């Protein structure tokens, strides 16, 4: 058994949303920066259709009118993909990879912001199928036909699985860094490491790199820090991967 790719989509997607500064926060004088993280909520397949529901959790840091410490406001930018997908059925397996490639914030007025995000969207769908090979001729007269044989290496997809897990850790600020007051922003990058097959399972490792921007407790000035956490996880593919050719 293997998994055949029956649909593929790769395009940049641009979405925007307005957000209002809460009443408890001062007016915006100048936008300092904007950051965000893409969160996929759901993936659905129907006959000839693929739907992906996601959103960008954005953070905008700005200077308040009249001076003072920088302020932070959160914004949600919805991302909805409705794709025509010939060949896709309700039994197809959807895979979605959304990457934030750009984000910016613009002041519409001192109490309202426009946040625009650009996302690289990659959506694929797979169908369970069987591989078949022809290794010769059969039937009347087949013995009179000369057949040239050769060897080829193929790499079929034998399983498509996903797993959600949580990585948590506690960090200490590096020596010399000011004590943390309010957390202004944080961002996360995930880098995969080794991947190996053990029976029907895939064992994989990686590193979570987190960057933070915060207000110093005593001075209110902005400071930044970075931290790393390694992880190791396992996922069951329900497929025998003991062959040395599996990767």
Language-model-detected regions and their locations in the chain:
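Viral structural modules
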Residues: 1-247
């Amino acid at each position: 058994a293997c998994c055949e790719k029956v649909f593929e989509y790769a395009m940049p997607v641009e979405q925007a949303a307005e957000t209002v500064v809460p009443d408890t926060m001062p007016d915006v004088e100048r936008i300092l920066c904007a950051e965000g993280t893409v969160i996929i909520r759901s993936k659905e397949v129907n006959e000839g259709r693929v739907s992906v529901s996601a959103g960008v959790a954005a953070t905008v840091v700005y200077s308040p009118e009249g001076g003072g410490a920088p302020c932070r406001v959160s914004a949600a930018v919805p991302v909805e993909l409705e794709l025509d997908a010939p060949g896709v059925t309700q039994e197809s397996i959807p895979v979605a990879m959304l990457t934030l490639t750009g984000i910016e914030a613009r002041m519409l007025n001192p109490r309202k912001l426009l946040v625009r995000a650009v996302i690289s969207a990659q959506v694929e769908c797979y169908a369970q199928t069987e591989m078949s090979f022809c290794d010769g001729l059969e039937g009347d007269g087949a013995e009179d036909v000369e057949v040239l044989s050769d060897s080829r290496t193929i790499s079929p997809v034998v399983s498509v699985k996903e797993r959600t897990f949580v990585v948590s850790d506690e960090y200490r600020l590096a020596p010399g860094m000011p004590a943390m007051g309010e957390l202004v922003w944080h961002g996360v990058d995930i880098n995969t490491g080794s991947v190996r097959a053990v029976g029907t399972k895939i064992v994989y490792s990686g590193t979570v790199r987190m960057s933070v921007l915060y207000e110093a407790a005593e001075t209110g000035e902005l400071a930044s820090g970075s931290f790393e956490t390694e992880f190791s996880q396992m996922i069951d593919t329900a497929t025998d991967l003991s062959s040395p050719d599996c990767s």
